[in-house]
Curated annotation (Swiss-Prot):
This is Flagellum-specific ATP synthase. InterPro entries: AAA+_ATPase, ATPase_a/bsu_AS, ATPase_alpha/beta_chains, ATPase_F1/V1/A1_a/bsu_N, ATPase_F1/V1/A1_a/bsu_nucl-bd, ATPase_T3SS_FliI/YscN, P-loop_NTPase, T3SS_ATPase_C. It catalyses: ATP + H2O + 4 H(+)(in) = ADP + phosphate + 5 H(+)(out). SUPFAM superfamilies: P-loop containing nucleoside triphosphate hydrolases. The gene is fliI.
């Protein structure tokens, strides 16, 4: 009996091999379903190949994510409800791709470049959904300031074109609002915004209230919502990088925004665990940290164009040291803007923490005078922070520290430096002027 089964298997594989070599589509079948992925017999499948699962009532797209013995692991893009053992799996000979080009600017699209409103898109081209490998010698040094349009960021944590930075904060502190301000007010030629794992309700709110009509005009918005397959969330992030590199290759300065890279990590963890990877810190698999590093490294200044990356990072319990994703990204990125819940409660929006935030490239981008004034301001704020509670309950003794006394005497002006309405734009020159005024008050 075993001999008959072995001969049938050899005959099947030979027939599949002939079909594959002749360019015909090879098919197999589902043999089991395990949670969010399927096991199938599918000869000649490669990791990353797209497949189509055909049942009596549905056609579901999916992707090969790994192997287990002689079986192929398939992650469907849609829920597997209604599929059954023996359903046909058709191997597509091409890798997964997305539509990109000028036709998607001003559009809200899925990870494959299809407009979510079902409308028409103009000229586009197909590009594979894979992260680029960038020759380090093709990169240029980052020398030019990137104007975010946000006063506190421009003045105290100046960014450069091609820099990658994270916005770190707990839930509800204003990450998305700050991201929307930078989207609307920055001087980027094209903005690529990836909304990964957002609730469906929040997507519409973000587009209308945070991004706005003006922000959308120069943006490509890639959406993969919380209720979708984890592989679609990962594809959404990769799709955003593909769009960004397409426009950068045309010599444009691109701003790549991702909200949030934490949800991307959670999605990749699901895929990694399903594929049999060993869990490490808090269940995160090795592929999570590799993916985050590759996403971050896709940014930079190139011989043609640049990609400036800003990623929101959801910090568990507002403590970066206890969050493996936040802690890992601190070492991968070129700086961090930390939002403070304490400042948010006091109505200081954007709630940027001036003492803990940092741009590693700032010393190479600004004048010595600018850098000195920014450091002085942060040093003074650090000293004030040490005694702030005493000041607010009336136990601080005036004269203990002359610099702290100056902050107390000018506290309203100091706090107004950080306050900025979402619709208010403050360019780089205006930000420097505001810093000069604060410096003259405190010096």
């Amino acid at each position: 009996m075993k001999g008959i089964r072995r001969n049938l298997q050899k005959s099947y594989l030979k027939r599949c091999s002939e079909m594959y070599l002749r360019g015909l589509k090879v098919s197999g079948e589902i043999v089991s379903a395990k949670g969010i992925y399927l096991e199938a017999i599918l000869p000649f499948a490669n990791i990353g190949n797209e497949v189509e699962i055909q049942s009596n009532s549905r056609r579901i797209r999916g992707e090969v994510i790994g192997f287990s013995g002689d079986k192929v692991l398939v992650m469907p893009y849609e829920p597997v409800f209604g599929l059954r053992k023996g359903d046909k799996v058709l191997l597509k000979n091409e890798l997964v791709s997305t539509k990109t080009g000028n036709g998607v600017v001003g559009k809200v699209v899925d990870p494959f470049g299809n407009p979510l409103d079902g409308g028409f898109i103009g000229f586009v081209e197909e590009k594979g959904l894979e992260l680029p490998q960038i020759n380090p010698l093709y990169r240029e040094r980052i020398r030019e300031v990137f104007d975010t349009g946000v006063r506190s960021v421009n003045a105290l944590f100046t960014l450069g074109k091609g820099q990658k930075i994270g916005i770190f904060a707990g839930a509800g502190v204003g990450k998305s609002t700050l991201l929307g301000m930078i989207t609307r007010h920055s001087k980027a030629d094209v903005v690529v915004l990836a909304l990964i794992g957002e609730r469906g309700r929040e997507v519409k709110e973000f587009l209308e209230e945070v991004l706005g009509e003006e922000g959308l005009k120069k943006s490509v918005v890639v959406v993969s919502t919380a209720d979708q397959s984890p592989i679609l969330k990962v594809k959404g992030a990769i799709s955003a990088v593909v769009h960004a590199h397409h426009f950068a290759s045309q010599g444009k300065d691109v701003l790549l925004l991702m909200d949030s890279i934490t949800r991307l990590a959670l999605a990749q963890r699901e895929i990694g665990l399903a594929a049999g990877e060993p869990p490490t810190l808090k269940g995160f698999t090795p592929s999570v940290f590799q993916l985050l590093t590759r996403i971050a490294e896709s940014c930079g200044a190139f011989k043609k164009g640049s990609i400036t990356g800003i990623f929101t990072v959801l910090v568990e319990g507002d403590d970066i040291s206890l969050d493996p994703i936040a802690d890992s990204l601190m070492g991968v990125l070129d700086g961090h803007i930390i939002l403070s819940r304490k400042r948010a409660v006091r109505g200081l929006f954007p709630a940027v923490d001036p003492v803990r935030s940092l741009s590693r490239l700032m010393p190479k981008l600004v004048s010595e005078e600018h850098f000195m004034k920014a450091n002085f301001f942060k040093e003074v704020l650090s000293k004030f922070e040490d005694v702030e509670e005493l000041v607010r309950i009336g136990l601080y003794k005036g004269g203990s520290n002359p610099l702290v006394d100056k902050v107390i005497n000018n506290l309203e002006k100091v706090e107004s430096f950080f306050k900025q309405k979402p619709e208010e734009k403050v360019n780089f020159e205006e930000s420097l002027k505001a810093l000069d005024e604060i410096y003259s008050l405190l010096k």
